[in-house]
Amino acid sequence: MEDGRTDDGTPPVIVGPRGELSDSKSRDIMSRLKQKTGSAELIQANLSLMETLGGPPLTARNHVTLLVDGPETFASMSEAISEAKEHVNVETYIFDDDEVGRHFADLLIRKQSEKVQVNLIYDSVGCMSTPPAFFKRLKDAGVHVLEFNPVNPLKVKKAQLLTNRDHRKLVVVDGKVAFTGGVNLSGVYSKGRSMGSAPGAEAQSGWRDTHVRIAGPSVAQFQQLFLETWRDQKGPELDEKKYIGEMKPEGRAYVEVIGSTPGALNRLTYFMYISAIKNAKSFVHLTTSYFIPDKQFVDTVTDAARRGVEVKLILPGVSDSKLAFYASRSRYEDLLESGVKLYERRSRMLHAKTAVIDGAWSTVGSTNLDLLSFQYNNEINAIILDTDFADAMEDLFNRDVAASNEITRDAWSQRPPWDRVMEFFSRIFSGTL
């Protein structure tokens, strides 16, 4: 692809507020993107890959707001839901029966009473600890409630559906504003809950996470993904014409919405990460709560470091899963040997799933860098092509680095024997994580 064109000479498809742009406008946008970001190969490879795999087109004129941690995210989502006039669609892995969960349940019930249709998808495994009465209250109020792939053996039709979980976190309000990222509807963001931890890194406060608020044409793509899941799970019929309408320009960011599902050709988020890291020229900065990928992904990361790209990876110093904590650490040796810089976040459980590459390409979403997210779960990520947003992401990344302990090769070689044993056995079972 050269000068904003694909291999057959046509520019990539770009969607604006009024629909698909002409070839000439798309070509102009690609030219401006290359000039502004200086990351032509990275952006072109990403768009070419998505077109080849049948992924969604790039959308123009979006406004993206970075939301840091639960309280800020909850406040922004609450404000948007409170102002809803037509509908609210919520898709979440966890919806806890705690102070935060009850706040949102009350808010959704209030909006339903105001004739705003509320549609909710919750994951059966993620909400296993939430009592059925919690969701019955929502149903009784008129909210359409859908349980994703029920664990109940009497309800599930195929065994493989037990491993296919809906790990997405998505809220769409009136088809105009969307929220996505790593934040579940849970009170863990105001208080800690951890099991495994590095020495001196015990949890002291709520979880550290990242979310985004997006307005603009890309919201239609978020809405479409929600509606697809709703149909697949046999939810009550919805008049989709009421959910996807005319979009307005809201900002200057270019956004691509990636929804991945199980299946060799449906792992769009995995392929997106591989492509972006392979085409990085300057730096790759990754933040994830679990790092348990396959060999190809690890090789892609280490190859980038060996060719001179600055690769930094922030992981939790405290975790909600001891097995996942040590399974992630079992990959440290290969990463450190290649020159990857590793950091473990102190004091707070790190739950963010983000990346910023070469100061131009960013992603925020629900996808962990592990086999569950890449192979078995329904996940959702926003790819943002905007240097201002990338600057904000980089600032947040550096703040997390400052609040982390760097893992050096010397320090890693001196870790206790018991840690090595835990890493060995955790790696054996990492395929189940």
Segments (PLM) and residue ranges:
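N-terminal localization/anchoring segments of enzymes in phospholipid and broader phosphate metabolism
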Residues: 1-271, 275, 279, 303, ...
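A short glycine-/small-residue-rich loop at the edge of a beta-strand within enzyme catalytic domains
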Residues: 264, 288, 292, 319-326, ...
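A general structural signal for well-ordered alpha-helical packing
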Residues: 270, 277, 298, 311, ...
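Helical hairpin unit composed of two closely spaced alpha helices linked by a short loop
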Residues: 280, 290-312, 316-317, 321
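Histidine/acidic-residue-rich catalytic or RNA/ligand-binding cores of hydrolases
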Residues: 295-299, 325-327, 357, 377
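C-terminal structural cap/anchor segments
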Residues: 309, 313, 321-368
